[in-house]
Amino acid sequence: MLDKVKNVIVVLSGKGGVGKSTVSTQLSLALRKNGFKVGLLDIDLCGPSVPYLLGLEGRDIFQCDEGWVPVYTDEFQTLAVMSIGFLLKNREDPVIWRGPKKTMMIRQFLTDVRWDELDYLIIDTPPGTSDEHITVMECLKEVGCHGAIIVTTPQEVALDDVRKEITFCKKTGINILGIVENMSGFVCPHCTSCTNIFSSNGGVSLATYAQVPHLGTLPIDPRVGVLAGTTTSVLDELPDSTTAEVLTHLVEKLKTMLAS
């Protein structure tokens, strides 16, 4: 039930381990910080990490006449979250499903969740271009998807896989809003200087290759990692950090792009 959702954004990456779920959660929190009502849908069925990242493990979802009721992070219901992680008894329980069952679950997430009125729905996806992605794109064609944010790290091995994701978006007709380069440089926890421990500017070159906007470059910041397991936004806890600056600019760019 996405008829009350104004903007649907899919967060993608062809490579695992690039911090896509962290980007999704912190982007959702940043949008909430800016006064928007936000939904976060985690469709990584085999590796759901959003409940852990937001400290919501152990919370239950319920059914009402209108469908599943998502988990809310606060009493004001400004951030709604849905994940298969809420349906598992233990975090260690594996989801061993074949494609058709995964497809059915994702369709349920997209059609049977009572999101109410949302300014943004952020959909965090698993890496790759598998059944899950095809199902999401097919379902979103019926209700409309406003675009995809693609997350990469600067290393060439990640860029190769992310190029495939760009091709996937073009073939399925999904508009690419832009590319976020994550884990670019390491922020010293003592002096906060940033050192490039890997290659750099991979996201910039990828954006140039795909002819899409470069939405920002996020470093590895141990102070941000400490926020895992909470609903605290980087914008609140570390307002002067590079991560907060990039997320602030990202929110402004999204507002501009989706308003036009």
UniProtKB/Swiss-Prot annotation:
Disulfide bonds: none annotated. It comes from Drosophila simulans. It is found in: Cytoplasm. Its cofactor is [4Fe-4S] cluster. Binds 4 [4Fe-4S] clusters per heterotetramer. Contains two stable clusters in the N-termini of Nubp1 and two labile, bridging clusters between subunits of the Nubp1-Nubp2 heterotetramer. Its main location: cytoplasm. GO terms for biological process: iron-sulfur cluster assembly. ATP binds at G14, K15, G16, G17, V18, G19, K20, S21. InterPro entries: Mrp-like_CS (IPR000808), Mrp/NBP35_ATP-bd (IPR019591), NUBP2/Cfd1_eukaryotes (IPR028600), P-loop_NTPase (IPR027417), YlxH/NBP35 (IPR033756). PROSITE patterns: MRP. Keywords: 4Fe-4S, ATP-binding, Cytoplasm, Iron, Iron-sulfur, Metal-binding, Nucleotide-binding. Signal peptide: none annotated. This is Cytosolic Fe-S cluster assembly factor Nubp2 homolog. The gene is Nubp2. Component of the cytosolic iron-sulfur (Fe/S) protein assembly (CIA) machinery. Required for maturation of extramitochondrial Fe-S proteins. The Nubp1-Nubp2 heterotetramer forms a Fe-S scaffold complex, mediating the de novo assembly of an Fe-S cluster and its transfer to target apoproteins. The lineage of its organism: Eukaryota, Metazoa, Ecdysozoa, Arthropoda, Hexapoda. One of its GO terms (molecular function) is ATP binding. [4Fe-4S] cluster binds at C188, C191. Heterotetramer of 2 Nubp1 and 2 Nubp2 chains. GO terms for cellular component: cytosol. Belongs to the Mrp/NBP35 ATP-binding proteins family. NUBP2/CFD1 subfamily.
